[in-house]
Swiss-Prot record:
Residue numbers annotated as active site: D52
Record's keyword terms, sorted: Isomerase, tRNA processing
Protein family (similarity comment): Belongs to the tRNA pseudouridine synthase TruA family.
This protein's name: tRNA pseudouridine synthase A
Organism: Borrelia hermsii (strain HS1 / DAH)
Amino acid sequence: MKKILAEIAYDGSLYYGFQIQPTKPTIQGEIEKALEKISKTKVKVHSAGRTDKGVHARGQIISFYIRINIKLKNLKTAINSLLRKDIRIIKLKYVADEFQPRFNAKRRKYSYYILNNENHYPWEGYQAYYVKKKLNINRLNEMAKMLIGIHDFTTFSCIKDQTNSKLKKIYFARFKKKNKLIIFEIIGSSFLWKMVRSIVGTIIDIEIKNEPVYTFKKILNSKNRKFTRTTAPAKALFLDKVFYE
C-alpha cells in the first residue's frame, strides 16, 4: 500500500471549510466519501492546511493511502467522477510514507481578490470583496511591505486560535492591479486562523479612512486583537500553492 499525494482545487462557497464535520458538507468529507466508494474501505485524508468556510483553493495538497491496485490516472478519473464539480483532483503522485502535507510544507501562498470598480457585472463579485472607494495601490503596498520578515501576528489572530506561537515569517506580500481587481498576494511559512483576512480587512479600513500608513505598523506591533479592524469576507480568499522546497 503506497501513500499518494494529491493536488486539489475547489470552490469553497458551499462548504463549511476543509476539515470534516459530522453533519455539515466539507471538502475533506466529500473526498473521503469518494475514496471510500472506490476502495470499499475507510480512508483518512490529511491536508497541508484547513481552509475556513467559504475559502477556495487552487493548490491544496492532501495525502492518503488506498488499498487497491489502480493506475494513478485511472484513480484520478474515478475520484473526479464521484466528486461534485466544485472539487477537482488536479494531479496525483506517489510519496514516501514519511511525507506529511502539513508538517513538510515550507511555505504557503494565498491570494485575496478585491473588486475595486463600480462598473462591474454582478457575477464578478461572487469570489471577490467589493470595495466601492477607489483604493490607492501605492499606499496599500506601503502597508504590505511592513509584513515582510518575522513578526508576532497576535493582532491578526482569532481568539479561537489555540496556536502556541503567533510568530510567523512572511517572505512576500504585495497588492497588484489586474483590470477591475486588486489582488493581494502573500507567501509565508504558515498562517494563523483568519490571519490573511484580518490583515486585508485592516489595510483596507486604514486606506478607506485615509489614515497614515504607519497606523498599520502600530496595529501590527501592538500584539493586541482589539486593535484589528474588519475581517475581510472569506469568499475572496484562495490558497494558491504549497511549497515543499
